[in-house]
Amino acid sequence: MAHFKPLGKKLRLAKALKQNRSVPIWVIIKTNRRFRDHPKRRHWRRTKLKA
């Protein structure tokens, strides 16, 4: 990836990075393990972004 990125692309990449987290422990406990993982989790090598 280029060192210089347009601001819009940088913001989209930052949003994707924040979205790509596991479900917090407190949510798993509170929902009685109903939500252990989320289906939109993305692996950097398998699925590429359209950013």
From Swiss-Prot:
GO cellular component terms attached to this protein's record: ribonucleoprotein complex; ribosome
InterPro entries in the record: Ribosomal_eL39 (IPR000077), Ribosomal_eL39_CS (IPR020083), Ribosomal_eL39_dom_sf (IPR023626)
GO molecular function: structural constituent of ribosome
GO biological process, one term: translation
Keyword annotations of the record: Ribonucleoprotein, Ribosomal protein
NCBIfam families: PRK01242.1
Family membership: Belongs to the eukaryotic ribosomal protein eL39 family.
Full protein name: Large ribosomal subunit protein eL39
Species whose genome carries this gene: Hyperthermus butylicus (strain DSM 5456 / JCM 9403 / PLM1-5)
Lineage: Archaea, Thermoproteota, Thermoprotei, Desulfurococcales, Pyrodictiaceae
